[in-house]
Amino acid sequence: MSDTTDLMGARVEETAAAPATDASAPATGAGSRRRRGTGLEGMVLAELQQVASGLGIRGTARMRKSQLIEVIKEAQAAGGAPAKAAPAAADTAGETKPKRRSTSRTRTGDEAPAEKAEKAGKADKKADKAAADKAAAQQQIEIPGQPTPKVNASAEQAAPADDAPSERRRRRATSDAGSPSATDTTVAVETRAEPKADTSAPQQSQGHQQGQGDARSDAEGGDGRRRDRRDRGDRDRGDRGDRGDRGDRGDRGERGRDRRNKGDDQQNQGGGRQDRQQQGGGGRQDRQQHDDGYDDDGSGRRGRRGRYRDRRGRRGRDEIQEPQINEDDVLIPVAGILDILDNYAFIRTSGYLPGPNDVYVSLAQVRKNGLRKGDHLTGAVRQPKEGERREKFNALVRLDSVNGMAPEHGRGRPEFNKLTPLYPQDRLRLETDPGVLTTRIIDLVAPIGKGQRGLIVAPPKTGKTMIMQAIANAITHNNPECHLMVVLVDERPEEVTDMQRSVKGEVISSTFDRPAEDHTTVAELAIERAKRLVELGHDVVVLLDSITRLGRAYNLAAPASGRILSGGVDSTALYPPKRFFGAARNIEDGGSLTILATALVDTGSRMDEVIFEEFKGTGNAELKLDRKLADKRIFPAVDVDASGTRKEEILLGSDELAITWKLRRVLHALDQQQAIELLLDKMKQTKSNAEFLIQIQKTTPTPGNGD
């Protein structure tokens, strides 16, 4: 009876540390499981190793369970005492076997090294008294359903080496056991109620399978691990976890697996897909999506396009964000011409060409304010602060005026292409001083009106630049209400300077040392600027020098179409210059655009001839210069017979028209040189064209009078 009491006392001491160790079993999901079989087959690997050590068998740390059982049986058979294995097994397994019957078998994978060492020492001491305890231990082994004896107060105290791991496992089990099944399993461990523990273990395993399914599929990526979680847990804890004596590798693997399980449980508690909320969690990707607070209508951090991206795009066209201006911002006023490109716009502050001080304008601001290419804008930009990253272009933060008016007034403007064009009706008189014969001759042979589309056909070195300057000065002197724009494309720099100093108007230039793209950019922006002024009802006069060089620039800058005309001219290169020249018109309800362009001829280039042929029939006024007269230093070298204006009867009065026709008859009968010399001589004798025409009327006989 004393031997039995000693054996029960040993089991009570071992059981005192077992509840804290086994408390983590509900959290890990293994559940309590009954011992299968009796005798050596019903023991776990650690118990078999202790039995083998009691029999004096060495080298059992690397043996499998089946091998260890065979070695023990052989040792028992060789020693002739098969019953001796039972007392040793009772001494070693009696410490934990009642506990294992009522709870879980996951103790050995989580045992601390100190606990293992203590057990090994106890097993060696009790090997000597195995014979004395044989009957009692054999009785314990043969009764698998024996309940665990109650633990007294003295046995409840465990070693510090056992308390630390079990305390950590208890806290982990408490924090992870959030489901009702886990709570029931914990209660079952505390009360040692074997039926309740057996029923709660499948529930706990099922809860872990549902909660950890999606998260573990992302972390481990194996479908086989999700098939049978309970079998995998039993195998890990029964076979792999029970090899604690093989070294620290098994302990580290078990602890790492516990940490992964804990992380998976915490991830599942974080949230998951909406359609899997009943499972306790979802995938990592959906959890991050919900944690960030984004839905399908918003734009998440991961750049997801969203289900309603088409509707959001349509709303974005109308919902324009205004630039925010703070109180401490320093605003700098800006002004310039708006140039709208494909995806953005700029205010050209330094002229009509791109510059480093241009101001960026978003397309949202363009659409909101109804801005168009060529508008003159005034506004403000924000001055960069110290330490602030400086952008390449400052953005427009405030729009003050559009073409001198409030921004809201520019939305209802008519479109230039929808305006009704008419023949010129209001005459632009170019006569100024009596000594300036160039403008006086133009008024006589080729009168110009508002909305005229005139072509100055000029061979090289015929004085076309001087004629352009004279026309520009005459327009600014006699018609100050007209907005004058002189566009010089592919010209010499000194001519640009001379034109800027001699003309009181807007000179827009792109010299020949610049690329062809600059020539086309300047011309397009200039004509768009003129159109915007015409839409407002202004009269605009554009002097272009020359349209031939503009056609050359488009031929170089425009992409090749594959259809090459005579002279190497691309078929698509002639349309932009024709669009430029065709913009001249007289508007029915007010406003006009007059364009006088020069065309080069007799240059020896087939390309120039092709370009001139395209424009020869497009104008309604033509002033032709002659190279022979220029070679003889007769200026202005105007070919009187070849020059003229269509529908000149609209611009001239009846009396003036009749006298002009008489003059043309007289000059037509003379040679070209004689005609211009006679005309210049008679005009020098008079102070004005009106006086000259009266003199012509008196001296020239009327046809049909018989004189």
UniProtKB/Swiss-Prot annotation:
Residues 331-406 form the Rho RNA-BD domain. One of its GO terms (molecular function) is helicase activity. Residues 16-31, 76-93, 153-163, 203-213 have a biased composition (Low complexity). It comes from the Bacteria. Residues 107-132, 215-265 have a biased composition (Basic and acidic residues). Residues 176-188 have a biased composition (Polar residues). ATP binds at G449, K450, G451, Q452, R453, G454, K461, T462, G463, K464, T465, M466, R492. It holds the Pfam family Rho_N. The keyword Ion transport does not apply. SUPFAM superfamilies: Nucleic acid-binding proteins, P-loop containing nucleoside triphosphate hydrolases, Rho N-terminal domain-like. Its EC number is 3.6.4.-. One of its GO terms (biological process) is DNA-templated transcription termination. Disulfide bonds: none annotated. Keywords: ATP-binding, Helicase, Hydrolase, Nucleotide-binding, RNA-binding, Transcription, Transcription regulation, Transcription termination. PROSITE patterns: RHO_RNA_BD (PS51856). Residues 301-315 have a biased composition (Basic residues). Belongs to the Rho family. PANTHER family: TRANSCRIPTION TERMINATION FACTOR RHO. Facilitates transcription termination by a mechanism that involves Rho binding to the nascent RNA, activation of Rho's RNA-dependent ATPase activity, and release of the mRNA from the DNA template. HAMAP family: Rho (MF_01884). Homohexamer. The homohexamer assembles into an open ring structure. This is Transcription termination factor Rho. It comes from Streptomyces lividans. The lineage of its organism: Bacteria, Bacillati, Actinomycetota, Actinomycetes, Kitasatosporales.
